């Protein structure tokens, strides 16, 4: 399922501990929060600290993301048109669906990340777009619910869109706007983000890079339908944050294609 996590770039903490992944048992107080132990895949959180994003040119990254997203929109325009038509013909409601998501949090650069305000969202909020794959009354009660691999709330065409990951195509527009990158941790809704930040140590440090349409966690792990699934994805997300590079992004983009074609992994 992926390689063991290693070579993290970290910052020293007040305790003087380091951040390391390996095959050893779960030993730190943070690791205890990740119980039951995740050892099946050779991944385990041994000791934690602040995970710092690997350095890379923001300008080059931005240009690359805009170019790829723009080209993808042009090439995939016929697919986008067919998907929009299929949604319109098979279910009532809008073609596009938007949700507020939690984006990048740059406060770690000024050491203000943990000087939280009362209504701290954990990152810059933005509106993320998707092709609608659920019934219009899927969340009529207003409560945010985790998406599942076989979600009963999805429409007939929505099931196919999710399996092929075509429902994510409108997020190419989010990339052009600067809300997201092609590659990065998947953004979460504010209510679910707040819950996960409270339950999972280091979860908020995923926000130190822009969220993405696809990511290292998505090509290595299936749909997260429970807290334990999210905990495993956090390991992959933090590895990406620490080792991000343009070459790694290209690799993940190429690895995403078979995930879409053969319906492996998950968003």
Spell out what each predicted region is.
Residues 207-225:
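Long, charge-enriched, surface-exposed interaction segments in small proteins/subunits
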Residues 1-74, 95, 240-242, 267:
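N-terminal hydrophobic signal-anchor/signal peptide
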Residues 230-241:
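Short helix/strand-capping connector loops at secondary-structure junctions
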Residues 134-135, 146-210, 253-256, 260:
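A short, structured surface patch at a secondary-structure boundary
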């Amino acid at each position: 399922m992926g390689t063991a996590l290693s070579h993290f770039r970290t910052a020293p903490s007040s305790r003087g501990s380091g951040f390391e992944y390996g095959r050893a048992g779960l030993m730190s107080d943070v690791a205890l929060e990740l119980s039951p132990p995740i050892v099946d895949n050779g991944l385990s959180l041994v000791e934690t600290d602040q995970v710092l994003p690997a350095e890379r040119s923001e300008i080059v990254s931005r240009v690359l993301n805009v170019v790829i997203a723009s080209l993808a929109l042009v090439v995939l325009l016929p697919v986008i048109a067919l998907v929009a038509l299929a949604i319109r013909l098979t279910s009532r409601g809008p073609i596009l669906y938007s949700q507020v998501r939690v984006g990048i949090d740059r406060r770690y650069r000024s050491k203000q990340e943990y000087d939280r305000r009362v209504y701290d969202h954990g990152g810059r909020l933005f509106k993320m777009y998707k092709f609608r794959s659920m019934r219009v009354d899927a969340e009529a009660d207003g409560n945010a619910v985790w998406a599942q691999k076989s979600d009963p709330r999805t429409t007939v065409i929505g099931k196919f869109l999710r399996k092929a990951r075509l429902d994510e195509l409108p997020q190419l527009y989010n990339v052009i706007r600067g809300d997201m990158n092609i590659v990065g941790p998947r953004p979460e809704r504010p209510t679910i983000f707040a819950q996960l930040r409270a339950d999972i140590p280091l979860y908020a440090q995923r926000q130190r890079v822009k969220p993405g349409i696809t990511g290292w966690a998505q090509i290595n792990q299936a749909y997260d339908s429970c807290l334990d699934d999210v905990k495993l994805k956090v390991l992959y997300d933090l590895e990406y944050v620490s080792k991000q590079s343009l070459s790694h992004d290209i690799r993940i983009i190429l690895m995403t294609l078979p995930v879409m074609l053969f319906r492996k992994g998950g968003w």
